[in-house]
Amino acid sequence: MSTSNGSANGTNGVGLPRGDEPEIIAVRRGMFGNRDTGDTSGYGRLVRPVALPGSTPRPYGGYFDAVMDRLAEVLGEERYAMSIERVVVYRDQLTIEVSRVQLPAVASVLRDDPDLRFELCLGVSGVHYPEDTGRELHAVYPLMSITHNRRIQLEVAAPDADPHIPSLYAVYPTTDWHERETYDFFGIIFDGHPSLTRIEMPDDWEGHPQRKDYPLGGIPVEYHGAQIPPPDQRRSYS
């Protein structure tokens, strides 16, 4: 059975190939990534691309091959190709990038199959890459198999223009508040969640404060007798 990496585009569920090369998500200039001309560090002319790791060729190492072999066997060749965008092993962590349409089905297999048994989802982490066109919003799900003492993670991407990802509440009920927090801070809409409302910010809050395009602001703070202005009013070198 073929288990080659990647074929489904996670933004729309259509079978489009993903490249095996690292994915450039930003270009940083200067040592501190500043965007103006006020760099006084002497490193203002540095240019560094920021990239996500590309697909990892087999063998993956350790139990990772056994996990992917079994997942491919249960899904079947056609469904595997529709579901799995690519497989990345980076710093001893297996990440399975999944088409968002197929996320609940893949998670159900990982939870229920006796040879996999990833019974526990440890949470949901949102990430915003504003320069990753068409894949600006990412959701990452760390999974753990208590039965087999294994850890992997799933990753799903969605565009800013259509920030919808299927909820995993029906598969892992413990994601309830985690998905609410990710919605609150990043604006990812988890379709099928039983009560997708803000959990930390006020209900009438505008915007999602952990997105990189969220405006910097704040209130002044008094500390040891000194008045510290909010971040958007502090001294700059521009």
Swiss-Prot record:
Annotated GO MF terms: NADH dehydrogenase (ubiquinone) activity; NADH:ubiquinone reductase (non-electrogenic) activity; quinone binding
Instruction: Give the reaction(s) catalysed.
Output: a quinone + NADH + 5 H(+)(in) = a quinol + NAD(+) + 4 H(+)(out)
* EC class name: translocase
User: Which stretches are tagged as biased composition: Polar residues?
Assistant: 1-11
Which InterPro entries does the annotation name? NADH_DH_suC, NADH_quin_OxRdtase_su_C/D-like, NADH_UbQ_OxRdtase_30kDa_su
Whether Transport counts among this entry's keywords is yes
Q: How does it assemble?
A: NDH-1 is composed of 14 different subunits. Subunits NuoB, C, D, E, F, and G constitute the peripheral sector of the complex.
Q: What is this protein called?
A: NADH-quinone oxidoreductase subunit C
* Species this chain originates from: Mycolicibacterium smegmatis (strain ATCC 700084 / mc(2)155) (Mycobacterium smegmatis)
Q: What is the lineage of its organism?
A: Bacteria, Bacillati, Actinomycetota, Actinomycetes, Mycobacteriales
